Curated annotation (Swiss-Prot):
It comes from Bacillus subtilis (strain 168). This is Uncharacterized protein YisX. Pfam families: Pentapeptide (PF00805), Pentapeptide_4 (PF13599). Keywords: Repeat. InterPro entries: 5peptide_repeat, PA_immunity-related. Signal peptide: none annotated. Residues 63-102, 103-142, 143-182 form the Pentapeptide repeat domain.
Amino acid sequence: MNKIAIQKPNIPENLQTADFHDAVTQDDVISMHLFEDCTICGEDIERLCVEKTVFRNVVFIDVSFRHIELTDVIFEKCDLSNADFSGAVIHRTSVKQSKMVGMNVAEATLRNVSFEECHGHFSSFSYSNMKQVRFDHCALMQSECSDTVLQQTHFDGCELEGASFTGTSLQNMDISTCRFEQLHVSLDKLKGCKIAPEHAIAFARALGAVIV
C-alpha cells in the first residue's frame, strides 16, 4: 500500500498550560495551549477556533463544538466519545490512541488529518469531504461514511465490520489490510477497489449472492 504523505501539525515547543473554560472565556481563538489530564464538560460553543494546541489525556463529556475550526492540533489519548464536531473544518490535525465512540464529524472538511489506533465505533463522517486523510489501525465498526468524498484517503489495518460507505466512491481505494465480514457499499462505486480474497464473500453478499 502506498503511503499518503500527510502534513503533520505544526506545534510550537513551548505551550501554555491552561484551563479550557478560562481559555474560551478570555480568547476568541485558542492558540498555543496545552490541555492535559483534565475533563471538558458541558461546553456548547459554535464556530470555536483552535490552533497550535495539544489535548493530552483529556475527557470530553457532553460537548458540542459544531463548525469548530482546528488547525495544527493534536489529540493524544483523549476520550471524544459522543462529541459533536459536525460541520468542522480540520487541517493538519492528528488524533492518536483516542476514543471516538459515537463521535459526530458529519458534514466536515478534513485536510491532512491522521487517526492512529483510535476506537471509533458508531462514529459518523457522513457527508464529509476528506483529502489526504489516514486511518491507521482504527476500530471503526458500525461507523458511518455515507455520501462522503474520499480523496487520497487510506484505511490501513482498520476494523470496518458493519461500516457504511453507501453513496461513497471507493474507486481505486485499497482496503485489503482492513478486516470486515459485512460492509455497506454502493455497487456502482467500487470499480478498482482493492480487497483481500477473504473480502470477496462480503462483496458477493452485497451483490445479493447466497453463499452455500
